[in-house]
Amino acid sequence: MASRYSPDRSADMGRESPVRWRHGTHRLPGVISRPVPVSDPVQRPVPVSDPNHRPAPVTHGPDDVALVFESGGMRGAYTAGLVRVMLEAGLSFPWVGGISAGCTNTCNFVSRDTWRTREAYLGLTTDPQAGGWGSFVTGKGYFNSEHIYLHTSAPDESIPFDWETFSASPTTVRLGAFRCDTGEEVYWGLEDMPTMADLLVRARASSSMPVLMPMVEVDGAPYVDGAVGPTGGFAIDAARVDGYDKLLVVMTRPEGYRKPPMRRHEIEILQRLYPRYPALVQAVIDRPENYNRTVEELEHLRSQGRVYLFRPERMPIANGELRYDRIVTAFEAGLAQARRELPAIEAFLAS
């Protein structure tokens, strides 16, 4: 079945379901179209963790702009370059939200961790438990989300997360996931996550791609990647509910990209896999239309000066990439583009 099915297409789809709001109560990138090997750890010239981490200081930032991170799987390594550049520049935002890989970038930005912005992606390339087709056939998912989200973020683990800084942030945070039994997009905020465990299970749910990864239960309800929701992978609906109409949207696809519709055999696979969740099936089928509509809306808002779109000039990797050298290339390319665009971003924020 896997040989007939293109993960990049199944996971790149979403339905116009209602947005459920839970007091600030997240991914569905398309994954790879071919197997890729995990890199040799010996070739990895980075430390396992950074014992000298200090949160990046805040020096300035707008009070009326929401920062929105698109989903995109490992393509988020490219946009992580922008996360680092903005942190190094001392920027902060009153509202930050994301879906799937956008959830990872959201959390690293709010925790102001310049080291983890890179390592959250590079660290997976040499972790034998992170995923791959071997993980998929054993039922753990192409990306082993249980390991990635629940067993790497503690202080003594491979990619420690600065929970103290994150949880103390005055920023409004929104992470979105798709609830499979009701067809709702649910957004969670800091008020829903009093512990790091509460955050991690929600980040995991936000990033659990249909077909390629198991559903994740949160408070007894089944969730998958939030990118199958009504916007196709952009938390702009959550930003609007919170009163923000000026947006910096960080995208993982280049200018001109549009999602193609699903093929008939892909739809049949979804229907066989999820007979108990018709809302999920329809959401995945509808995602190309929803995604394309959102992109067109954002481009229109950009023409009015209400939105800044950071788009990769060229995306060098697929969303399921696990090769160290490819991830480094993507991150460095994103870093270089972000440094070139920072003056334009700063001008937009000040306008």
Predicted regions and their residues:
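Patatin-like phospholipase
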Residues: A2-I99, C107-S351
